[in-house]
Amino acid sequence: MKKVEFLPIKTEIEMPNGLQWHDKKLYVIDQKTDNIFILNEKGKKLDEFSTLCENGSGITIGDNFIWLASNGETEARPFRGSDTHISWILKLDMNSRNLISRFPTPDGGGVHGLEWDNGLLWVTAFNPTALILVNPDNFEVQFKFEIDQSPHGLAIEGEGIWCSDRVDRNIIKYNKSNGKILEKIEIPDDGPDPHGLSIKDKILWYSDAAFPNPMRPFPEIGSIELR
């Protein structure tokens, strides 16, 4: 088990729940506003735009689309006319930023993490707890494996996939072909609440939305140094 240090950057985002590195920019879905923020490596805001997401959780980018985990009824902001209070996976055009389509979750339950993987899409599931790989064109399940985690953020690293867990406060790397555990990071008591995950230059990044039931009274985005 590796020792870990969390290296935060400054952020003005109130509830950064999911994050994804893409083209040297960090895309973050804010659970408070359901807006997407685009940041540089130091956390400076480059852009911000609204979405039709509700209770935004995971975010990933693939095939020139932004994919969002819209995790059902929001508790972080007032309801909007566009809210359905149902969990969906949203598909947004990268250029227009408009909603192109939406898909039910593979297990019919809530959804936290998403991760693009060579033309396919990983999705977290809770009925039972599992990681599910789907075809993003029709959401047919290609592969899945059950896990002993309450899954949240996801990040692909080679033949492995990292998954964070807010309940047991750990981040586990699985072999994405068979579900075997490869590495495990235990988060210290004074560490962040691991919502989102992404990876850049072989370095893991995390986000802590500080909602609901926060471990600490402030949000955080940063990188993870393993020793």
What do the PLM-derived regions correspond to, one by one?
Residues 30-43:
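Beta-propeller domains
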Residues 3-11, 44-49, 98-104, 139-145, ...:
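A short beta-strand motif characteristic of beta-propeller blades
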Residues 195-227:
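Blade-level signature of beta-propeller repeat domains, shared across WD40, Kelch, NHL, RCC1
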Residues 28-32, 68-83, 123-128, 163-168, ...:
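Conserved beta-strand positions in repeat-built beta-propeller and related beta-rich domains
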Residues 40-44, 93-97, 135-139, 175-179, ...:
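Short loop/turn segments that connect beta-strands within beta-propeller blades
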